[in-house]
Curated annotation (Swiss-Prot):
Lineage: Bacteria, Pseudomonadati, Pseudomonadota, Gammaproteobacteria, Enterobacterales
One Pfam family here: ACPS
Principal place of residence: cytoplasm
Protein name from the UniProt record: Holo-[acyl-carrier-protein] synthase
An annotated GO BP: fatty acid biosynthetic process
Organism: Hamiltonella defensa subsp. Acyrthosiphon pisum (strain 5AT)
Gene it is expressed from: acpS
Length: 126
């Protein structure tokens, strides 16, 4: 397989905290899938949860080479974890259409955070 695209994104956690303080759960409802929203509502560190999901989804859109345009939305990407905690991306709707068009066979996702930032890297292969 060949690398078809790569995307990375970094999010300042304090910025996400400020958005949530101003608008409550509006950000969560805008970017999270129903499954992610359920996880967010039960998470011990909800601000970090959203920051990492946002970074992952932005990185995924960049890896497709499009960013968020032509109908692609943050909720078209979903982050899940396997039994060891490794993150994986699921794609739907426009994200899936674009992945099929590009002949994407696999997605690789890495997410990390520290005191002030969350970062994600996505590599797509086909």
């Amino acid at each position: 397989m060949a690398i078809l695209g790569m995307g990375t994104d970094i999010v300042e956690i304090a910025r996400v905290q400020a958005i949530i303080a101003r608008s409550g759960d509006k950000l969560a409802h805008r970017i999270l899938t129903p499954l992610e929203l359920s996880e967010y509502q039960q998470h011990q560190q909800p601000v970090r949860f959203i920051a990492k999901r946002f970074a992952a989804k932005e990185a995924a859109a960049k890896a497709l080479g499009t960013g968020f345009r032509n109908g692609l939305e943050l909720r078209h990407f979903q982050v899940i974890h396997d039994e060891l905690g490794k993150p994986h991306l699921l794609v739907s709707d426009k994200a899936n259409e674009m992945a099929v068009r590009l002949s994407v066979k696999s997605w690789h996702l890495s997410i990390s955070d520290e005191r002030h930032y969350a970062i994600a890297l996505v590599i797509v292969e086909g």
